[in-house]
Amino acid sequence: MTEITAEGNASTTTTVIDSKNGSVPKSPGKVLKRTVTEDIVTTFSSPAAWLLVIALIITWSAVAVVMFDLVDYKNFSASSLSKIGSDPLKLVHDAVEETTDWVYGFFSLLSDIISSDGDEDDDDGDEDTDKGEIEEPPLKQKEIHKEKAEKEEKPERKILAKVAHREKEKVKEKEKSEKKATHKEKIEKKEKPETKTMAKEERKAKTEEKIKKEVKGGKQEKVKPTAAKVKEVQKTPPKAKEKEGKETAAVAKHEQKDQYAFCRYMIDMFVHGDLRPGQSPALPPPLPTVQASRPTPASPTLEGKEEEEKKKAEKKVTSETKKKEKEDVKKKSDKDTAIDVEKKEPGKAPETKQGTIKVVAQAAAKKDEKKEDSKKTKTPVEEHPKGKKQEKKEKYVEPAKSSKKEHSAPSEKQVKAKTERAKEETSAASTKKAVPGKKEEKTTKTVEQEIRKEKSGKTSTASKDKEPEIKKDEKMPKADKEVKPKPPQSQVKKEEKSESQVKKEAKPEQDIAKPEKTVSHGKPEEKVVKQVKATEKAAIEKTVKPKPAKKAEHQEKESPTIKTDKPKPTSKETPEVTESGKKKIEKSEKESKEKAEMKHLKEEKVSTRKESLQSHNVTKAEKPARVSREDLEDVSASKKAKEEAEDVSSTKRQKSPISFFQCVYLDGYNGYGFQFPVTPAYRPGESSGQPSSPGQKQQGQ
């Protein structure tokens, strides 16, 4: 507001100044245009001015008489009296003549001054009449005609000058064409002897000569025709180049003799500036030679470049084929290991016989996880060391089981104690976050539906699952020799990379962790089943480190739904477990160890994104194992295809968001685009591969 008032005050002050003056100020240029003649005319227009002029003349004349002693007073007085007495008329005439002479001289001076000013005014008037095209008296018209004739002569001279300039340009263009022709002749002459020599030299050593010519700076033009020669041997020159070569050859035949002499003449002309009188040295003549030299050698250089590009392309193709072969070999090895793991996993089915409970828990877990993940934020990082300690304890439990069958009972007790502790922790965590009743109702409905479906399929799977165990035991020792990685180091590195990927991996483990709770509340005969599940859990925890608080909350939410459905499956499981006996326990221990080792090998080879996919494969492989072995093989083949497709897409996703984020970063700082609406797309793009995996699980069921 202050600026506006200041501007208003400034405008008012200017108007006040104008009003005080009372008249619009005139530019000083108009005042200066008044001439001396105008001033004289204005002064002498009035009679008072003339009286003043006469008075001035008389006074200054009297002053002059007195100053210079123009009058002899003695003679004047004596003679005047005598003259007057003798001849008074003579005196009067003499006096009048003298005064008239004085007056005439004075007026002549004034007339001269006025005439000079009048001439200047006449010149100004002539200019004005030229502008306005007003009719003048005949004398002035003659002068104007003369001026117009002079003006007409000037454009004629200009036209003549233009014609001469065009002629000069034509001469220059002719000279340029001659220069081009001579330059083409040069190149053709050089190419002709080289064609003869190349016919012989190509057989001996093409590569050595090319290297020598490239090293020598002065023979660069010779290298270009050699490349052109090689192109002709390959029969791939374009038709336009062949036509140009024919034309230049025809010109070269006519002017072979004068070639070098003319070139020397041109070089001397350009270097020393010995130009013809018609040429203007202002225009630099060396340019045409450069332009003429470009078109002809361009073709061999292009041909040489194309050759090099073809060679490079062939090398790239060979290198890419080698890389593809290596990658295929790696993929085959990965597939073999995956097949071994998936074949070993069905051995769990006859030992545990809890396919229904697992499928129920996993189906409920998937729905709850999708709802809860949207609500939950990142859990604190302090909970990671707890998960590590629990995993280490369970690792020590596994070798004890494998070495001695007798100590299986105390190890089972330890696993029970651990699971009970985990349940207590989950109950404490779940009290903080209340679960809505609608979710529980949905999960119970899905649990009941899936139990009904899988009751019918249980009886047929029992006999089929026992047969493949013998073959799998033979493959176990080989896998033990092959796989000896360091799992904890790789896991620590992966945790440091991203917490978001750990969240993704937490889901599959939660699916497997839930069946343990259901068994822990069951009968004492299910201790063997619990031991097998503990080993499975330990193997999976080695591969995937989730956040325990999340897991606890999932377990607490899903535990009431699973408890209601317990009595149906456990009645069938108990007789089947007693039949298997101690042999199954040994097999399960070996299988769990080898599975853990195979998974660690895969984790080291594959990226962090692949890790989540493999953890899903564990849960997927357990489900079809309870249906049939043939279904398992079909599902495993489909999984491999999905894994490969997702691996390729994951690598692309890892690369593309980085470049995209860099572009956004630059635009944001330059101010050409909004930084905030665009950058969030980076996170969903990165995690877009994860939501598809639960859908794949449901398809597997």
Curated annotation (Swiss-Prot):
Compositionally biased residues, Polar residues: 8-24
One Pfam family it belongs to: Asp-B-Hydro_N
GO terms under cellular component: junctional sarcoplasmic reticulum membrane; plasma membrane; sarcoplasmic reticulum
Cytoplasmic face of the membrane: 1-47
Residue ranges with Low complexity bias: 684-701
Keyword check for Transmembrane helix: yes
Disulfide bond among keywords: yes
Protein name: Triadin
